[in-house]
């Protein structure tokens, strides 16, 4: 996994996300930090465009931006 600047990743709009999944990420058994750094379910990105396209992890990317993170761990596929 690499640390990737959020400014290099495509934007995610709240209206395209599932509210219950966002709630689960924020209030679930595992902390958001644990879920963000998950090696079993990593955030996956595609490098093929000028901003990295999200393959997996849209909800986590959205919340990381909301929480003020500047970078996140991700894998490129």
Predicted feature residues:
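Short alpha-helix boundary/capping and kink motifs at helix termini
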Residues: 1-55, 65
